[in-house]
């Protein structure tokens, strides 16, 4: 395995720090602190470089609790200060990112840019739509409390396998040790370090067990193959390997036959793969019931507002258009026709356009 060196000089360079501040400030430049830093970019870039050199770039986290989307799960966020914390995280990751991306599995999604829900969905549809012959059985599992459970010692050992620059390692170790246990949800570095930590698991599944189709979305794993015995054996080894990583698989893991139409037209047998908000069967993809219900409610509400000529909020308009876009990637023609096409999308786009213009004018006024 190739180990990388001469990274410390890249991280602490003023050019890298300047770029890190600009990247960290994206979509935040209305905030007073961010505006002050950007207005004095050169001074702060030099200061950040010095802080990284003397390992003085961390301050206490602010804790915040949120409810995560439609799932309703409560999550604890650790929010770092913009300067110097977030800027330092970007400076570190600008150097570390290419190393992690270089060895990442193609169907490892969520933690890497341009590999979101649609990319994960394509990975599953490679099996269920394009390779139906081998899309017979599925293993679906989830790592329990993934971010908070990652052991610092084993993560540091994993970093040492990839990097030989001791000074750079001390900087990244300081970020890891800034949180008592696991990786904090909210740090820019956390998803990238989590991706690096699970890369050996991806290699085990694809190279040792040669599972025909495997997709991972953060800590959710889907394995698809025509051989049930092979999946059982892989499942056993995954449990052992994940245990060695200091993690654990949730008890509700499943091994089941994938839903498909029967040739005698007696209906369907098997179950759909419920993954990334969509349900996959052999030859078709639909939206998860909870997401479909949310779209139906929002569609009726918007239709009522449009009938009464009442104004529609930007948040509602943008959310509905986003939900409708999800239906384009699924076999949900009847629902799209009933709930999306009955809404005046042109009016919603006008609301979004007007809000964008208002934001642009507001930014110009500030300058």
Labelled PLM ranges:
Residues 1-46, 364-367:
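Non-catalytic, polymerase-adjacent accessory regions of viral genome-replication enzymes
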Residues 3-8, 89, 93-151:
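Active-site-proximal segment of RNA-dependent polymerases
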Residues 36-52, 68-69, 194:
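N-terminal accessory alpha/beta regions
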Residues 51, 125-218, 222-237, 257-258, ...:
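Conserved polymerase palm-domain catalytic core
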Residues 51-73, 87, 164-178:
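Reverse-transcriptase-like RNA-dependent polymerase core
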Residues 74-105, 180-206:
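Conserved pre-motif C helix in the palm subdomain of viral-like polymerases
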Residues 86, 90, 178, 232-239, ...:
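Right-hand nucleic-acid polymerase module
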Residues 110-120, 222-224, 255-264:
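Beta-rich nucleic-acid/ligand-interaction surfaces
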């Amino acid at each position: 395995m190739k180990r990388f060196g001469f990274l410390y000089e890249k991280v602490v360079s003023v050019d890298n720090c300047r770029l890190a501040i600009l990247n960290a400030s994206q979509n935040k430049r209305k905030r007073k602190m961010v505006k002050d830093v950007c207005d004095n970019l050169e001074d702060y870039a030099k200061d950040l470089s010095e802080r990284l050199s003397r390992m003085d770039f961390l301050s206490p986290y602010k804790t915040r609790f949120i409810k995560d989307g439609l799932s309703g799960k409560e999550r604890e966020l650790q929010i770092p200060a913009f300067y110097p914390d977030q800027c330092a995280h970007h400076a570190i990751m600008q150097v570390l990112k290419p190393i992690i991306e270089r060895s990442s599995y193609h169907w490892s999604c969520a933690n890497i840019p341009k590999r979101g829900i649609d990319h994960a969905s394509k990975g599953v549809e490679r099996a269920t739509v394009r390779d139906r012959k081998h899309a017979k059985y599925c293993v679906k599992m989830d790592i329990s409390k993934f971010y908070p459970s990652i052991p610092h010692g084993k993560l540091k050992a994993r970093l040492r396998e990839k990097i030989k620059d001791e000074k750079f390692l001390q900087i990244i170790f300081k970020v890891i040790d800034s949180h008592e246990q696991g990786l904090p949800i909210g740090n820019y570095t956390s998803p990238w370090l989590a991706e690096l930590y699970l890369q050996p698991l991806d290699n085990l599944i694809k190279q040792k067990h040669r599972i025909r189709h495997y997709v991972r979305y953060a800590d959710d794993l889907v394995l698809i193959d025509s051989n049930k015995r092979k999946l059982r054996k892989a499942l056993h080894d995954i449990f052992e390997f994940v245990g060695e990583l200091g993690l654990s698989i949730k008890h509700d893991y499943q091994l089941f036959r994938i839903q498909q139409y029967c040739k005698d037209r007696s209906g369907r047998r098997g179950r759909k793969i419920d993954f990334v908000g969509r349900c996959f069967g052999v030859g078709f993809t639909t939206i998860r019931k909870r997401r479909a219900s949310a779209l139906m409610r929002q569609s009726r509400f918007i239709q009522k507002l449009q009938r009464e000529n009442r104004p529609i909020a930007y948040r509602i308009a943008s959310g509905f258009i986003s939900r409708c876009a999800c239906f384009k990637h699924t076999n949900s023609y009847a629902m799209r026709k009933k709930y999306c096409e009955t809404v005046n999308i042109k009016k919603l786009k006008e609301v979004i356009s007007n809000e964008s213009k208002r934001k642009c004018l507001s930014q110009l006024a500030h300058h």
